[in-house]
Amino acid sequence: MSESSSEDENTARLKEAVWSFKPEDVKINGKENNGRQSHRADVSKHEHDGNELGTTPEFRSHVAKKLGTYLDGCISEVCSDTVEPAQSENREDEEGFRLFSSSTPGKWMEQSPPPPPKRRPVPSSSDSDSEMEMRFREAAVSLSDILGPVAQNLSEKTEEKSTKEETEDTVTKMKKKKKRKTSSEESQDKVNHQTEKQSNVEGNQEQTTAGERLKKKKKKKKKKRKKLEKDIKKDE
């Protein structure tokens, strides 16, 4: 069988090789033979074997297999149970034909098209808000449901961070308040010190003025005494 199939393939290839060449006009004694037309069949046109497209037998067998599988998939049997055919007067209806060797005899029907999908009714304006709210509530999912223990750990960490930040904020605020108090106290001390200095300076100035006045009075008294002594000496 293998030798015969290989020989058939070789002959088919040789035929295809012969058919691929077109007949050329033959020159006889330097002249073209265009006077008479030959009545021979043109092998390259494949009119004698029905192969106008020039396809290979392998390609034709492949296409036949594909068509057979496609038609077998399209054709469906309504009654899958094997029923014995009842004798009837009209035998012409019972006698049918088979498309392929694999097809089974029986009545065939085209499948009815599937019914169109039902469309949802358009909600009214009054009930649309409540229905949408209910749907949103049903569809709402929390992070704890999705993540589970990871979400709990994250929430605990965030809470710890928030508490730490709050404590740090309170500590910084207390420090700022203390600094403000100390700065205000220092400013008050400076003011008091300056006022004390001013008061001391004023007291010193007053003391100096009083001392100068006393000195001036003493000088005046001395001068008066000296004059009196001079006058007394003159009178003597």
From Swiss-Prot:
Residues 197-210 have a biased composition (Polar residues). Belongs to the CUSTOS family. Residues 10-51, 156-165, 182-196 have a biased composition (Basic and acidic residues). Keywords: Developmental protein, Nucleus, Wnt signaling pathway. Interacts (via NLS1 and NLS2) with dvl2; the interaction is negatively regulated by Wnt stimulation. Interacts with csnk1a1. Interacts with ctnnb1; the interaction is positively regulated by Wnt stimulation. GO terms for biological process: anterior head development; negative regulation of Wnt signaling pathway; Spemann organizer formation; Wnt signaling pathway. One of its GO terms (cellular component) is nuclear envelope. This is Protein CUSTOS. Residues 214-227 have a biased composition (Basic residues). Signal peptide: none annotated. The keyword DNA-binding does not apply. Phosphorylated by ck1/csnk1a1. Essential for Spemann-Mangold organizer formation and subsequent anterior head development in the embryo. Inhibits canonical Wnt signaling pathway by antagonizing nuclear import of beta-catenin (ctnnb1) during embryogenesis. It is found in: Nucleus envelope. Pfam families: CUSTOS. The gene is custos. Named Custos for the Latin term for 'guard' or 'keeper'. It comes from Danio rerio. Disulfide bonds: none annotated.
